[in-house]
Amino acid sequence: MAKAKFERTKPHVNIGTIGHVDHGKTSLTAAITIILAKTGGAKATAYDQIDAAPEEKERGITISTAHVEYETQNRHYAHVDCPGHADYVKNMITGAAQMDGAILVVSAADGPMPQTREHILLAKQVGVPAMVVFLNKVDMVDDPDLLELVEMEVRELLSKYGFPGNEIPIIKGSALQALEGKPEGEKAINELMNAVDSYIPQPIRATDKPFLMPIEDVFSISGRGTVVTGRVESGIIKVGEEIEIVGLKNTQKTTCTGVEMFRKLLDEGQSGDNVGILLRGTKREEVERGQVLAKPGSIKPHDKFEAEVYVLSKEEGGRHTPFTNDYRPQFYFRTTDVTGTIKLPSDKQMVMPGDNATFSVELIKPIAMQEGLKFSIREGGRTVGAGIVTKINN
């Protein structure tokens, strides 16, 4: 069977459901597909199809995630839902499923719970730009004062973790009523999708961001000079443009004198392309794997940062024992390993396998970084953790 061509007529946004266990994330995901299927915007997907989420591997970590897609009048969405709490933690820290926005599901009958808090905090740490709240199970609450109280609690919690709690849309409804085909259930889902459409901002496309390419390999071509290869992470590089080589050593300026892909010469390379870039006047020994090529001034090298990290459990192939302050593993950024020292917060004695933790790191060499950069922690060549830079300290 021929694959249907993906028609890109509407802007695309990645979102996901987050929230406490049993508050109705998967039911809501199913309800969205079933309601939108009525107008041809989705393929109706039942609860148990979503709940049986396939396992995926991302940077050596196994994560269960369910993906559904649907369309509203304005946008095309890819929506991710995870079955277990640990899957959410891993998913958000590894960025396995990038989220441009989230739907926070809170049960009106229970109010915010520990994982509600943790998911809001993680969303903030990993840079989820915006979220909309679905106050679920309102059919189980008879007292309007109680609903108001829960809404207030949710808004306070969002504000506490740095989201604009007062302006975030909160939609009240029941995913179950929507699944049962009740009109009030359906109305709430449509309201929710309108809020997601209007409140979650359109993400900046990778091609519109400043040019950045992690260097994978360096070659010397006699008579032409030095060529570096890699996959363009963001932006566009045109022949003749000035670029900087950042990380590991002092930043150097150079000029792109050629872009090559599949042995053909191009005028430009753009995000997603695997290219070779010819550098004017740069010697082969002045550039190495692990550095990046970047638009001048767009990124700086740093060696001190704070991170949110998921530490693999023993079952996942991680460490068998906890680690303590001054632990010195390898940090794998983009294309290279750099040794670094971990400093735990004063109230934390150790980090257990299977935990997620916040701590600071000092690398022995600076790496081109900005907040939101993902990395792996490795020990003797195997992955023992995955993290994201939440704050740069120097």
Curated annotation (Swiss-Prot):
PROSITE patterns per the UniProt record, alphabetical: G_TR_1, G_TR_2
Species: Rickettsia prowazekii (strain Madrid E)
Chain segments annotated as transmembrane: none
Record's subcellular location: Cytoplasm
Name of this chain's protein: Elongation factor Tu
Annotated tr-type G domain residues: 10-204
Annotated segments matching region G2: 60-64
Region of interest (G5), residue spans: 174-176
Family affiliation: Belongs to the TRAFAC class translation factor GTPase superfamily. Classic translation factor GTPase family. EF-Tu/EF-1A subfamily.
